[in-house]
Amino acid sequence: MDLRPEIPPASQAGSQVHPGAAAAAAAAASIPVSMAGSLLRAPPLLLRATEKYPRTPKCARCRNHGVVSALKGHKRYCRWKDCMCAKCTLIAERQRVMAAQVALRRQQAQEENEARELQLLYGTAEGLALAAANGIIPPRQNYEVFGPVSNESNSGESNIQKFELFPKTPLPGTVTPHQAAGKSVSTDTESVPGMSSPDMRHGSGSENGDRESIVSSPIAKPLKDGEETPGSISPIGSDSGSDTDKDEQEPSPSSAASRQMNAIDILTRVFPNHKRSVLELVLQGCGKNVVQAIEQILNNSGQAKGPEETWTAERMLQSVQPTMSSTPRPMLPGTMTLSNRSAFSPLQPNAPHFGSDPSTYPLSTHLGLNPLRLAYSAHSRGLAFMAPYSTTGLMPTLGFRPPMDYAFSDLIRDRTLLHKDQSYTNGLYGPLVNNTQEKQ
């Protein structure tokens, strides 16, 4: 049922339509006008804010107890400033946490601003370290832990401290031909007061905060220069150490040579009394295996330290006598002699088969046995061909000793004295002839 044609003429609506229907139509016609008026009218909340004063902070303690009071100038005179109720305690904890967060954010923002300014001035962490060492940048309170040590120590003490913390021979990647050519320049710069101590340069650090302090730390700095930028020239690499250390530094052509240098450095530290050339020969003979080289040197150190290890008169006499070894291996002259100290040797220094028969061991050169594994005899257990732990029981043709020599080696001293006066030949069947003479 459509009522639209009846609504516009008011005279017809009053005569033809029921008065109730006319009132409903008038109300429906007035709805859009009221909605438009409500949209044009400002919200009451904004009117209230513009009419009255703006919102001011209120005291939370007073609000917890039902009182509204402005916070400005109220903290000292608050009635509940010492209240210990649950709500007031929670407010105090929140205030403490917020204060700590604000202080931390301020400190971080200050550090970031300083780091940004210093990056614009110097550009890199190396420039920051150099500027801090020269006194251009005053060290912050965070880095004052290293201050007293670096200020009180001279160049000699700082070098000693550096040798305790870092390897004596720096990484070969940090040395460049330009640095080798500029040794005189670096020695002159070491006499400057600002550059006298390399630890001061490390200790003051950069001003970059927590993020860049890791990059400019004294341990991460040489590693970064040695691995990532081997050809870079840094003030830390050019001034650190003394002239004797710089003479020992040699540029390495490849990573394999650097690993070999590290292995030789380890051997020189473990055995400071041995020559470097001898250690290099041992390392090359062992296939550049540091563990085998250390075992080799320990096995042969007994011959070099024979006069010091005076366990018996037999040991002293043996150290004086020349070794009767046959053709030695090329790794070290004296390698084929019997080892007096081994990690697997039994605790029987007076055993006749252990110290008094030097010609029994060189037989292993003809058989191609390992010179490092001589410790126990295998023929006492009936294992004649057990190569890693064999002495005179290598083959049945080489002869056997009576078991009583090995079982009672510490008790039978007269037989040990007989062995030291006998001289054996280097022939393959020399021990066989001598053993037949010993049996009597």
Curated annotation (Swiss-Prot):
CDD domains: CUE_DMA_DMRTA2
Main function: May be involved in sexual development.
Name of the protein in question: Doublesex- and mab-3-related transcription factor A2
A GO molecular-function descriptor: RNA polymerase II cis-regulatory region sequence-specific DNA binding
Residues within the DNA-binding region(s): 59-106
SUPFAM superfamilies: Cysteine-rich DNA binding domain, (DM domain), UBA-like
Species assigned in the record: Danio rerio
Composition bias, Basic and acidic residues: 199-213
Superkingdom classification of source: Eukaryota
Gene Ontology cellular-component annotations: nucleus
